[in-house]
Amino acid sequence: MNAPPAFESFLLFEGEKKITINKDTKVPNACLFTINKEDHTLGNIIKSQLLKDPQVLFAGYKVPHPLEHKIIIRVQTTPDYSPQEAFTNAITDLISELSLLEERFRVAIKDKQEGIE
């Protein structure tokens, strides 16, 4: 079978970077972010967060091949705002939102457990 071993989908190899950034020469003020060992789950949530930013003109992602465990996110921004800054802000906002979700989830579980006991 041609499928790679399962561990290759989540373990970084020695010297392999999690994220690489390349300038997109086809359009102005754009970058390609390649994120290794990730899939549609992370790609879609980052793309959605990027599109909430009014200074982001375009955000999209693709998985080059089903057997390659990486995503490529393309971001184009207004001239006075860098794609790297947009990407960093999107990640920071996502971390905040997910932390709040976790906190609310824990409180709901605690409330439910106290109601049962």
UniProtKB/Swiss-Prot annotation:
Chief site of localization: nucleus
GO molecular function, one term: DNA binding
Localization (cell): Nucleus
One GO cellular component term noted in the UniProt record for this chain: RNA polymerase II, core complex
Keywords linked to the UniProt accession: Acetylation, DNA-directed RNA polymerase, Nucleus, Transcription
Residue list for modification N-acetylmethionine: 1
Biological processes annotated in GO: transcription by RNA polymerase II
SUPFAM superfamilies recorded: RBP11-like subunits of RNA polymerase
Gene3D superfamilies membership: RNA polymerase, RBP11-like subunit
InterPro entries xrefs: RBP11 (IPR037685), RBP11-like (IPR036603), RBP11-like_dimer (IPR009025), RNA_pol_Rpb11_13-16kDa_CS (IPR008193), Rpo11-like (IPR022905)
Protein family: Belongs to the archaeal Rpo11/eukaryotic RPB11/RPC19 RNA polymerase subunit family.
HAMAP family recorded: RNApol_arch_Rpo11 (MF_00261)
Role of this protein: DNA-dependent RNA polymerase catalyzes the transcription of DNA into RNA using the four ribonucleoside triphosphates as substrates. Component of RNA polymerase II which synthesizes mRNA precursors and many functional non-coding RNAs. Pol II is the central component of the basal RNA polymerase II transcription machinery. It is composed of mobile elements that move relative to each other. POLR2J/RPB11 is part of the core element with the central large cleft.
Subunit-level organization: Component of the RNA polymerase II (Pol II) core complex consisting of 12 subunits: a ten-subunit catalytic core composed of POLR2A/RPB1, POLR2B/RPB2, POLR2C/RPB3, POLR2I/RPB9, POLR2J/RPB11, POLR2E/RPABC1, POLR2F/RPABC2, POLR2H/RPABC3, POLR2K/RPABC4 and POLR2L/RPABC5 and a mobile stalk composed of two subunits POLR2D/RPB4 and POLR2G/RPB7, protruding from the core and functioning primarily in transcription initiation. Part of Pol II(G) complex, in which Pol II core associates with an additional subunit POLR2M; unlike conventional Pol II, Pol II(G) functions as a transcriptional repressor.
Protein's name according to its UniProt entry: DNA-directed RNA polymerase II subunit RPB11
Protein source organism: Bos taurus
Phylogenetic lineage: Eukaryota, Metazoa, Chordata, Craniata, Vertebrata
